[in-house]
Amino acid sequence: MRPWLLACLVACFVGAWAPAIHAQGAFEDCCLAYHSHIKWRLLRRAHSYQRQDVSGSCNLPAVIFFFPQKDKMVCGKPGAKWVQFGMKILDNRNKKDSKPHHSGRRFFQGPQSGVRKLSSGTSRPLLLKFSGPTRSSKRKASLLTTAIPGP
């Protein structure tokens, strides 16, 4: 057999085999187990959620709650009461954030639009100070990583 013919056969075999291997090894970020229950204090810190359907390597229907600290996520059973409550909280929060706020006051467009003067002195924008993670919040965040296997 000629070497170029062997090289063509190997190339065809690798070309046909590589997509199948790539599809099997594709990384899907999905839940493989449910969390039993998450306290309301932790659940209200979630910034979004996503429904997971059964497809591909994700063989468990779930609701995934995403938390801002260190890309944490919590998987819940869609029928659980705490999951329904969390979805309702986030839906209401997103609905409230997306709705434009109208008031009876008229603001003028200018370099300081949106800043109201509170006193006769100079006005300063309100600054909020955020503290770093505390020891107890790290402990609570570590509780989010434990899960109970689904049915």
Curated annotation (Swiss-Prot):
Alphabetical keyword list: Chemotaxis, Cytokine, Disulfide bond, Inflammatory response, Secreted, Signal
SUPFAM superfamilies: Interleukin 8-like chemokines
Gene3D superfamilies registered for this protein in UniProt: 2.40.50.40
Protein name: C-C motif chemokine 25
GO molecular function: CCR chemokine receptor binding; CCR10 chemokine receptor binding; chemokine activity; chemokine receptor binding
Broad class of where this protein is predominantly found: secreted
Disulfide pattern: C30-C58, C31-C75
